[in-house]
Design a protein with these regions (language model features):
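Short, low-complexity disordered leader/linker segments with a strong preference
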Residues: 1-24, 320-322
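Short, glycine-/small- and polar/acidic-enriched structural segments
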Residues: 15-155, 159-163, 180-183, 195-196, ...
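Short, solvent-exposed loop/beta-turn-alpha elements that line the ligand-binding surface or hinge
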Residues: 49, 103-104, 202-205, 274-284
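Short, hydrophobic secondary-structure boundary micro-motifs
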Residues: 50, 96-98, 248-250, 303-305
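Pocket-lining segment of extracytoplasmic ligand-binding domains
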Residues: 80-82, 163, 168-256
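Conserved C-terminal helix/tail region of periplasmic/extracytoplasmic solute-binding proteins
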Residues: 289-322
């Protein structure tokens, strides 16, 4: 969102304000019951004098990226890195500016079936339904990876059906039999009656899998604001590593209370880390190679078609340069 100056009709993107910043308001998307690195950065004072402007809920990575590219928000929601690779491959003018999350040995997340389900392997999923929040993102990639590693051929993989579920309904869909497998976390797992089939960490290990994307147009018009926000996010991620887990969760709970949205904070107590392996959320080519290789394997990309430096930039993450 642009800085509003009464009596001035000039677009804020062309203005220089406090500390050389082009805008003091920054539009973003959030998720109910969750605190993102961007929101923590603001609460810790790392974005000041910039204020976040909440634009609503993100339904998933691709929608979050599209929101940033269209200008509905100034940055994407934390989005699957594979979606960012597809974005660049299709020629869309956007750039990954900082990591948002990664895979790690998380006991509170995975892809689950009912405890008494006959599904015990990838092959058992043939003819079954799998719940997802959105098509073409992380759940779909990890499912296909699991099925391939389980020995399924493309024809068999196509017999596994993805079902798009409304936000927050995965557990209900699984327990009611609407789907046979669903991504679950925290409270849903603790309630029991479910069994983990696989998880992201089992498939890719420690890897940065989530990112923040910004439109190239916004970056060009707001370089100082971009630098302030991206560096602030990096600082917040490092802060979360350096503090005891219970203190980080307590901070999250305070943030939820202050923002006064209709949301349930039950997931917060299951937070352990954001799982970003690199210091200061810095990216390297290797973070994207797995997704590029997958697109090449599926025939969506040719060898050497992608210049990794067009996917991401650490230029605005000053904290990663320390």
């Amino acid at each position: 969102m642009s800085l509003v100056l009464l009596g001035c009709s000039k677009p804020a993107s062309k203005l220089t304000t406090v500390d050389g910043l082009e805008s003091l308001e920054f539009k973003y998307l959030g998720s109910p019951g969750i605190v993102t690195p961007l929101e923590l950065a603001e609460d810790l004072g790392y974005l000041a004098p910039i204020k976040l402007s909440y634009q609503g809920v993100s339904t998933g990575g691709p929608q979050g990226i599209q929101s940033a590219l269209s200008g509905d928000s100034d940055i994407s929601s934390p989005s699957f890195a594979g979606s960012a690779v597809k974005m660049v491959a299709s020629g869309v003018p956007g750039t990954v500016v900082i990591a948002a999350y990664g895979t790690f040995d998380d006991p509170f997340a995975g892809y689950y079936v009912l405890e008494n389900s006959p599904i015990h392997s990838a092959r058992d999923l043939i003819g079954k339904k799998v719940g997802t929040n959105i098509l073409g993102a992380q759940v779909e990639y990890m499912l296909k990876s699991y099925l391939k590693k389980g020995g399924l051929n493309p024809e068999e993989i196509n017999q596994v059906t993805l079902v798009v579920l409304p936000p927050g309904s995965a557990e209900q869909a699984l327990r009611s039999g609407h789907v046979d497998l669903a991504p679950l976390a925290g409270p849903a797992i603790e309630r029991g009656g479910v069994r983990r089939l696989y998880r992201d960490y089992d498939l890719v290990g420690d890897l940065t899998t989530g990112s923040y994307v910004m439109a190239n147009r916004y970056i060009a018009e707001h370089p100082n604001t971009t630098r302030k926000v991206v560096t602030g996010v990096a600082k917040a991620i490092e802060w979360s590593r350096q503090q005891p887990r219970d203190q980080v969760i307590a901070r999250f709970e305070q943030i939820l209370q202050k923002r006064k949205r209709p949301e349930n904070g039950a997931m917060l107590k299951y937070w352990t880390q954001w799982g970003i392996p690199s210091k200061a959320a810095k990216f390297e080519d290797g973070d994207f190679k797995i997704w590029v290789d997958n697109l090449i394997e599926e025939g969506q990309l040719k060898n050497n078609q992608i210049d990794y430096k067009k996917i991401y930039s650490n230029q605005y993450n000053e904290y990663s340069q320390h």
